[in-house]
Amino acid sequence: MKQVITAKLKLHLSKEQKELLREVSLVYRNALNYASKVAFEKGKVSSANKLQKLIYQDIRSKFDLPSQMSCNVPRQVAATYKGLWTKLKQNAEHLQLGQTKKRYKGLDKPPKYLSRTCNLNYKRDYSFVKQEVSLITLQGRIKVPYSGYNKHIKLIKSGKNTVKFGGAKIYYARSTRTYYLLVSLELEIPNIEPDAINRVVSVDVGQRYHAVTTDTRNQTHFYSGKQCNRKATCYEKARKSLQQKGTRSAKRRLVSLSGRERRFVADQNHCLSKQIATPNTLIGLENLTNIRERTKPRKTGKKASIKQRKANHKQAKWSFAKLHSFIDYKAVLNNSLAIKVDADYTSQACPHCGYTSRGNRPNKGLVFHCESCGFKLHADLVAARNIAMRTLLTRQDWESTGSLSATPDGSSVEAKAARLSRFAELRWTAE
């Protein structure tokens, strides 16, 4: 099994070296904008090979970039256009289904690159030499000392024996005026066998409680999102005030505020995922694909009440996918595994008698009260228990069939119906 992580290395540059990196990053950015303009004029090209044939010689002559960086420019621009075309197609589908009235405008003009970054290839553009990293510039190579997270430094020093080096990116942090090197590291990790798993944990994510976890031994943890939500409200008020002012200094402040809020949310998710992804654990997550479309509010914008607008904003800021991705990669590094199970009816099904109804959770509140057997419990914990039972069933299938994704033959709809039918027979007895 392979797992890719990113090592963030702080570059300790002299004044001359800093100027050389500034020069190459600005020239690279200008080359990206030139390539973006050409791609737009030639029919919004999203093929890297086609774009490279159109602009490679121009980039070499006009911007004096090294050959490998001149190849990276059309690849990066083509990838951007490919993403924009995907969004345009999705928007067309949503317009046809009546899910939105807004036309996607991402391809109305060529995308502009503002960040001072450079994409580098291992050995051709950068390499590690003893305690330094060798970086390419327009004036030749420079050797720069670096620092970073101790685990990442150890992996880099161990060399090709334990890690495979991938692409890297030079990144400039304007707030601290510091250059960083973001290096992709591919780790070879032994395949996880069912016998190595000694614990099953389920995770129910939400907005009031960012995560509620439980296992088959009834060890339960509630991770409140109160502090994070309060902080998000403060950021929202500050952002609203600055947007109303509209001055140049207010816009600069908005940029820094956006970065700070993003880093705060990422830090919260990192800390939470670290506590959840314990060693030798099978972690069950809800499959929340297209959850925003399925839970789309009835009223948005000016038609919605103030209360509804606040709820809509809170839902839009909900970063459950990021939390899932953090749990996923941290689990692999800890000899654990995160899998996704169907999220259908996890908050409506009684784990004791199996009765499923919306009435079991009155007004979608915090209390689950079964209309059939009278079982009463915290609604998020009920959801976590249902996820745990589904995860345990998946593990049993894994042990018996040797396949982690054992599904009955038939269409995806039939397969899902069969899975939900099996889930309805599960009962929670670990009291």
Question: Which residues does each predicted region cover?
Answer:
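Acidic carboxylate diad motif detector
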Residues: 51-175, 225, 313, 317
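Positively charged, helix-rich recognition surfaces that bind polyanionic ligands
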Residues: 4-6, 19, 177-431
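Generic structural motif
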Residues: 12-18, 138-140, 147-149, 158, ...
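Long, compositionally biased intrinsically disordered regions
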Residues: 1-73, 81, 89
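Stable alpha-helical structural segments in soluble proteins, enriched in small hydrophobic residues
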Residues: 35, 72-84, 381-391
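Short aromatic-glycine motifs in intrinsically disordered, low-complexity regions
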Residues: 1, 152-153, 193
